[in-house]
Amino acid sequence: MSKETFQRNKPHINIGTIGHVDHGKTTLTAAITRALSGDGLADFRDYSSIDNTPEEKARGITINASHVEYETANRHYAHVDCPGHADYVKNMITGAAQMDGAILVVSATDGAMPQTKEHILLARQVGVPYIVVFLNKIDMISEEDAELVDLVEMELVELLEEKGYKGCPIIRGSALKALEGDAAYIEKVRELMQAVDDNIPTPEREIDKPFLMPIEDVFSISGRGTVVTGRIERGIVKVSDKVQLVGLRDTKETIVTGVEMFRKELPEGRAGENVGLLLRGIGKNDVERGMVVCLPNSVKPHTQFKCAVYVLQKEEGGRHKPFFTGYRPQFFFRTTDVTGVVTLPEGIEMVMPGDNVEFEVQLISPVALEEGMRFAIREGGRTIGAGTISKIIA
């Protein structure tokens, strides 16, 4: 049996290292590749190759992030590591690398620090479902200070539980020692990856979720009816399925009478495919770009929500001035821009470029929204921020 086919059959998981600056996130990422390269499951990547991160763009925002690939016996992992705190905030909020779980790296010598707390909160707001903790720099702790590590652990458990992360496994080790080849500490990194394998479940594949397709374009075919086109976000749609058109106007129900791809008729369309759907009894003026076609009652139109937002700095092409309650930019969801009115939380007078903030939005027309969904904030055609819906209000 060739190795290639074996690799493709492993479930794929996206994870990332999060935590306070200088607690050892990048060193740990390198140490994981070192530990697994011994089993032929990873190519060893040294610190500088990960730290020298390429720039990428997500929703118009530049993010520095390194993507490292490796495998355990059971899974294939794509691991994201960011150099700066602002890059983490942007990466998590824009969903540039959507995480199925995260490894929270905490230095045993410092314990939980401000960014540790901020990353845990951010992970909760953007819907990172599971966290495994690596208590790093254990080699720096003297025997008489050993009890301090227990206190650090207790504080971490409390912090995590407060944000809804219960029963997170905590592995103690030293990323640097593992990277230097110390066998006992390499074993600790393996233990960490075993905990990741065991505690971060394989996510449901997009294909198994309820059907949804954002509409990009609408046109009529004489004698046949109205066709809507787009890329299927999730699920499967078959000819003669009942579907709903949701967003921007009143929800309508219809039946799919044809599925086409590259002008060929298909029995079904699947997640990830670009298709045209022929809809029964729907006029060209009944439907528009920005609505979604979906499994009936799987998504509802909403106008009001709470969100976690990163506001671009001036240098990133963002605003030059702060904004206040009553600010009315465009919110870009999937394929549509809708104007919304911002209400800042009590005690926050204004939002400055570069801030990471939570606020409420009231849209002027209803859109098919879900918690955890990403969006861009635009003003005059340029992106000035990005966000994730943390809670739907109405």
From Swiss-Prot:
Residues 81-84 are annotated as: G3. It is found in: Cytoplasm. CDD domains: EF_Tu (cd01884), EFTU_II (cd03697), EFTU_III (cd03707). Its EC number is 3.6.5.3. One of its GO terms (biological process) is translational elongation. SUPFAM superfamilies: EF-Tu/eEF-1alpha/eIF2-gamma C-terminal domain, P-loop containing nucleoside triphosphate hydrolases, Translation proteins. Residues 60-64 are annotated as: G2. Pfam families: GTP_EFTU, GTP_EFTU_D2, GTP_EFTU_D3. Changing V157A: In strain: F/IC-Cal-13. It is an enzyme of class 3 (hydrolase). Residues 174-176 are annotated as: G5. GO terms for molecular function: GTP binding; GTPase activity; translation elongation factor activity. Keywords: Cytoplasm, Elongation factor, GTP-binding, Hydrolase, Magnesium, Metal-binding, Nucleotide-binding, Protein biosynthesis. GTP binds at residues 19-26, 81-85, 136-139. It catalyses: GTP + H2O = GDP + phosphate + H(+). GO terms for cellular component: cytoplasm. Residues 136-139 are annotated as: G4. It comes from the Bacteria. Residues 19-26 are annotated as: G1. Monomer. Belongs to the TRAFAC class translation factor GTPase superfamily. Classic translation factor GTPase family. EF-Tu/EF-1A subfamily. GTP hydrolase that promotes the GTP-dependent binding of aminoacyl-tRNA to the A-site of ribosomes during protein biosynthesis. This is Elongation factor Tu. It comes from Chlamydia trachomatis serovar D (strain ATCC VR-885 / DSM 19411 / UW-3/Cx). The gene is tuf.
